[in-house]
């Protein structure tokens, strides 16, 4: 709605609308027309408007694509809320998270953190799972200085090979899930659209994609952390790598 408002004002008056104007429009006008907006955390609305403003500025300054209208049918949905007066809390003993406008909910907590909470981003992925990412402000610890330098060559058989001969192989377990993915996609093509079995198979595909993504993400993080921790200078190829 605020994107449509911004576009309408520009087309009619050739006038730029600031993120503050959009936020005021949401509070003064939209909340009158859409009562359910009053039930939503105010920081979530403000952050959504500010994110829209960033996309709008990139469109003009960096020639990025024009901001798109979001749909409730999108596979990925998220919102960000800010910390104030203890409105965000994580209890590791009970395994619960407290968020603004919500009661404490049970969650699988991966690891404890140190530092002051700044914000929380709640997201729902295509598999239907919900995730909460907590942003905290903490003291920066510099890595120990080392005299070792390294070069990295991206491979085909291996993920990459370093100049000292160490090879980081591509994960074989991913092939297992990729085979499952092909099988599920083949099954989906034989299901009647909008049938129960169609949506069940579609969810299995989403879960398989998620599994592959998480395994790959975790592995890349471990590899990059190892390389960064052990070397002072890192040199790599400047290639356009797809996928």
Question: Model features per residue range: what roles?
Answer:
Residues 1-243:
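Nucleic-acid substrate recognition interfaces
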């Amino acid at each position: 709605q605020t994107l449509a408002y911004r576009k309408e004002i520009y087309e009619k008056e050739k006038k730029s609308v600031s993120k503050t104007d959009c936020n005021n429009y949401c509070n003064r006008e939209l909340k009158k027309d859409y009562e359910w907006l009053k039930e939503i955390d105010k920081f979530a609305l403000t952050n959504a408007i500010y994110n829209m403003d960033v996309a709008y500025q990139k469109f003009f300054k960096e020639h990025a694509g024009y901001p798109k209208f979001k749909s409730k049918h999108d596979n990925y949905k998220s919102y960000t809320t800010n910390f104030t007066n203890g409105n965000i809390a994580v209890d590791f003993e009970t395994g619960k998270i407290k968020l603004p406008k919500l009661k404490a909910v049970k969650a699988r907590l991966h690891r404890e953190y140190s530092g002051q909470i700044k914000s929380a981003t709640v997201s729902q992925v295509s598999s239907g799972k919900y995730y909460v990412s907590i942003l905290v402000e903490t003291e920066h610890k510099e890595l120990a200085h080392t005299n070792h330098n390294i070069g990295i060559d991206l491979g085909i058989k291996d993920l990459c090979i370093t100049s000292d001969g160490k090879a980081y192989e591509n994960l074989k377990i991913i092939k297992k899930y990729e085979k499952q993915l092909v099988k599920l996609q083949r099954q989906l093509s034989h299901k009647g659209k909008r049938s129960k079995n169609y949506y069940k198979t579609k969810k299995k595909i989403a879960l398989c994609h998620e599994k592959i993504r998480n395994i790959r993400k975790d592995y890349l993080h471990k590899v990059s952390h190892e390389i960064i921790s052990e070397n002072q200078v890192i040199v790599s190829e400047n290639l356009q790598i797809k996928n």
